């Protein structure tokens, strides 16, 4: 009835006693793809190969720093302020897309002045490269058996994630139906939300953005599509994703991911309106 999640080791192999993890591999592949794809599109955006390399290296630094700081501030400030030594332990998990986005925006502001280009012109170059990284990251989450979805006993394609047992025992404590499921399967069946995110944030967003990036559009248009679509996809997908237990839901309705995605949609719409007004 349900799909049993195959238990993968988070470590693929080791090189000179340095563990190579799935999540790290996904980030590495995302960077290699972005570097390759960015260089093939450089001429269209009047960028040199060196400018592309410097831009992408800087964006990845902004992504990591912003992603980590964003996670600390948005999702778990109390823990990290009480355990400062854990801030640099990125391998233990804890990155925020929205924090990473802010980090990249800061980098783009710097490069827009350095290259004497409008920030939206540079962001139009960057955003088609993003979905591959998003998709790779979600696959990494799935392989690690983390960031699973909400409990879904009535969905026949629900997945049994071994890592969810601790939370599942607490959830099922006062529910006979859920208790019986744990007795039978060990854990509760959940939506494989990482796969949903891989499809929408990775595949669909990749094809849409790369389709429009090949068209002759006013600069800022591709960026507005990215902001609107990602924001809408994230708000929708959070319905299936298990809320972060340390913060739960705001007003018993909205997750942190949904709240942070709302300004993205608003900003994307404002950019699109501005483009429309200028075209007229």
Curated annotation (Swiss-Prot):
<feature type="transmembrane region" description="Helical">
    <location>
        <begin position="15"/>
        <end position="35"/>
    </location>
</feature>
<feature type="transmembrane region" description="Helical">
    <location>
        <begin position="217"/>
        <end position="237"/>
    </location>
</feature>
<dbReference type="GO" id="GO:0008961">
    <property type="term" value="F:phosphatidylglycerol-prolipoprotein diacylglyceryl transferase activity"/>
</dbReference>
<comment type="function">
    <text>Catalyzes the transfer of the diacylglyceryl group from phosphatidylglycerol to the sulfhydryl group of the N-terminal cysteine of a prolipoprotein, the first step in the formation of mature lipoproteins.</text>
</comment>
<dbReference type="Pfam" id="PF01790">
    <property type="entry name" value="LGT"/>
</dbReference>
<dbReference type="GO" id="GO:0042158">
    <property type="term" value="P:lipoprotein biosynthetic process"/>
</dbReference>
<keyword id="KW-0808">Transferase</keyword>
<keyword id="KW-1133">Transmembrane helix</keyword>
<feature type="transmembrane region" description="Helical">
    <location>
        <begin position="90"/>
        <end position="110"/>
    </location>
</feature>
<dbReference type="InterPro" id="IPR001640">
    <property type="entry name" value="Lgt"/>
</dbReference>
<keyword id="KW-1003">Cell membrane</keyword>
<feature type="binding site">
    <location>
        <position position="138"/>
    </location>
    <ligand>
        <name>a 1,2-diacyl-sn-glycero-3-phospho-(1'-sn-glycerol)</name>
    </ligand>
</feature>
<protein>
    <recommendedName>
        <fullName>Phosphatidylglycerol--prolipoprotein diacylglyceryl transferase</fullName>
        <ecNumber>2.5.1.145</ecNumber>
    </recommendedName>
</protein>
<feature type="transmembrane region" description="Helical">
    <location>
        <begin position="257"/>
        <end position="277"/>
    </location>
</feature>
<keyword id="KW-0812">Transmembrane</keyword>
<comment type="similarity">
    <text>Belongs to the Lgt family.</text>
</comment>
<dbReference type="GO" id="GO:0005886">
    <property type="term" value="C:plasma membrane"/>
</dbReference>
<feature type="transmembrane region" description="Helical">
    <location>
        <begin position="60"/>
        <end position="80"/>
    </location>
</feature>
<comment type="pathway">
    <text>Protein modification; lipoprotein biosynthesis (diacylglyceryl transfer).</text>
</comment>
<keyword id="KW-0472">Membrane</keyword>
